[in-house]
Amino acid sequence: DNTLYSYEHSHEYGMRSLASYCNRVFGVSEEETEECYKRANKIMMGRIGSETAAMHNRLMRMQCMLELLEQPLFPHARNMYHAYWDTFIQHIQSNPGILEFMKELKKRKIRIGIGTDMTAYVQYRKLEAIGVTSYIDFIVTSEEAGVEKPHYHFFDICVEKAGVRPEECAFIGDNVKKDIEGAWESGLKGIWYTQEKEPPEHRYFPTIRSFRGIDVDEFLK
């Protein structure tokens, strides 16, 4: 999320679809839907915590929204789940150059893995929509690992699946704490993907500003 594609772009469309459903079925305004969604997220975080993939489960979030709205769970929880995710995925747009970058890596026999905080099913759907599945050799989700990034166990599984030493792995991500610092602390080379932000003060990370036009041979040195 936010490395291969823009999460915010798709999330905006997903929330519009969810708000449309809630307005049509319950007479709830877009603003009320947004506020209820945020309240449900806060409640679920309090119950589940922030270190497990279950925190991302939108079905449970929709369930909590319906409880707050005092509306029936059936059939609305699943309908709201699909209203959000189906629209979200329909509007996924890959970040410029990512497909070409992966293609060039595969030409050079580089194994490509996906390391992501989220439930597996949704991430599989996203990857199919982005169009990168033919380049991917393995996937590690926080649902499989049982912990979220930056926990070392998550990165240990990434290294295990890559089949090489940690120092031979590059982990590209957009989140400094979860992706980059987590990778370096586990012995991998963390590479920060950021289009606008600057690294934290007194910290330096290898940085990718755009996947378009990357010199792959130079990148692999």
Model-predicted segments: where are they?
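Asp-based, Mg2+/Mn2+-dependent phosphohydrolase catalytic module
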Residues: 9, 24, 28-31, 75, ...
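N-terminal helical cap/lid subdomain that shapes the substrate entry/recognition surface
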Residues: 1-96
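Short glycine/proline-enriched coil/turn segments at helix->beta-strand junctions
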Residues: 67-70, 108, 203-204
